[in-house]
Amino acid sequence: AYDSAEVILTIFERYDTFREIYYHGIGYASKEALTRIDKYLNIPAMADYITSTRVPVDDVRVKFEEMNQPLDKIQALFTSVEDRDAARKEIEEVPGIEITGALPMNLEINAAGVNKGKAMIELGKVLGIPREEIMAFGDGNNDLKMLKEVGTGVAMENAIPSLKEAADYVTLSNDEEGVAKFIEKYVLD
């Protein structure tokens, strides 16, 4: 809801963060922050992706207030794990949300019930594929609910430890073509 998003944005603003808001699948970030994204993200390919796909705005807070409607997602990149963890602790008090993160120093906030796992199950319903026949692969914290939700959850060898523990299987790493090897062995053979 709009009120929850306003609270979360306020929390993120208290920390040194790169903030993004999403409406209808489009991400908005501050022009100024986009020019110094490397302060928050030391993965050049990901930084390039973000700077090339986000709509630059003068101020994220102003854009949020102008839109004046519920958003898809709020994301923040932090400069320290301590700040990320402190912000997460504050945000956990906000009702009706899901907290995740694909990167070591980020938090992604969605409405409760909005996650990759639910999306895959809904797509399966549309396509006539039962949950038991849906397989998903993941490596990060943002994949945890997905691997638990689907019929077969597979973690990559390079996945975070908690994801490996939750998965039904662990395959080779991304660099070793783990997804392809797993499908060849367990699906195609």
What is the meaning of each model-derived region?
Residues 1-3:
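Glycine/small-residue-rich loop that forms an oxyanion/phosphate-binding "nest" at active or ligand-binding sites
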